[in-house]
Amino acid sequence: MGKKRNKVSVIGAGFTGATTAFLTAQKELADVVLVDIPQLENPTKGKALDMLEASPVQGFDANITGTANYEDTAGSDIVVITAGIARKPGMSRDDLVATNEKIMRSVTKEVVKYSPDCIIIVLTNPVDAMTYAVYKESGFPKERVIGQSGILDTARFRTFVAQELNLSVKDITGFVLGGHGDDMVPLVRYSYAGGIPLETLLPKDRIDAIVERTRKGGGEIVNLLGNGSAYYAPAASLTEMVEAILKDQRRVLPTIAYLEGEYGYEGIYLGVPTIIGGNGLEQIIELELTETEKSQLDKSVESVKNVMKVLS
């Protein structure tokens, strides 16, 4: 018997889902199944075939399948959920939440049916609330249902700091806590350039400007694109989580995790520092927060709770 190959299913074959599928295959992390609704089955198959045909050129060995049939996802190690609608002009946030919650619940039923032992990573917005909806629908332990936003938010923060200091992004570390929105909390005290505290390298007004730009990072790209939202960086962030799990790397990554008293919050999904490894969420890391940071995080939690009130 040959060794079982890793299998990752990506639900939603839009820009983010397709890019995640391609990056996962390109890194030879797993065979990939890209899933979308029956009306989009042919375009989904087309994208998967196009990626597969890149493999001889890029030199990677991974099977990539496009489908509208969840049976093809059976036995997945990880399922990444990017499916959902984007907010349209004139659409209320509550409408968006209600619609995407329905999608999350129907997708999760299929995921649980065919991959009862998988780890689920959620990207669909509003991501904190959608991760909670998937957790409730799945019946999985909290370790196996996590959301992605903090890696992306932190990547934006690191990018802007690197640009400001004219340094390699590899040398910039940082952490963004809280919900994925305008109330996220970039922790400047825990941010470094080559091990040197950021606060010793940049004046407060420049740091404040970077923090503000990070909070508005998604909107900045939406405005520039004019149609659609970011997908390269979100897909790269998802792929980093997939790799950490499949290789059991025990990476310290900001992740949307279910809190049971950590940071003083109960029964809510929120972006916090975590250890991510072979079991999914291995551990939540509790940092000491200043009064200001804690009050900012409280505000972020209120924003998440307001969205969660709309959930059925």
Curated annotation (Swiss-Prot):
Pfam families: Ldh_1_C, Ldh_1_N
Active site: H180 (proton acceptor)
EC number of this enzyme: 1.1.1.37
Tree of life domain: Bacteria
Keywords: NAD, Oxidoreductase, Phosphoprotein, Tricarboxylic acid cycle
Binding-site residues, NAD(+): G12, A13, G14, F15, T16, G17, D36, N100, L123, T124, N125
PANTHER family tied to this protein: L-2-HYDROXYCARBOXYLATE DEHYDROGENASE (NAD(P)(+)), L-LACTATE DEHYDROGENASE
Protein name stated in the entry: Malate dehydrogenase
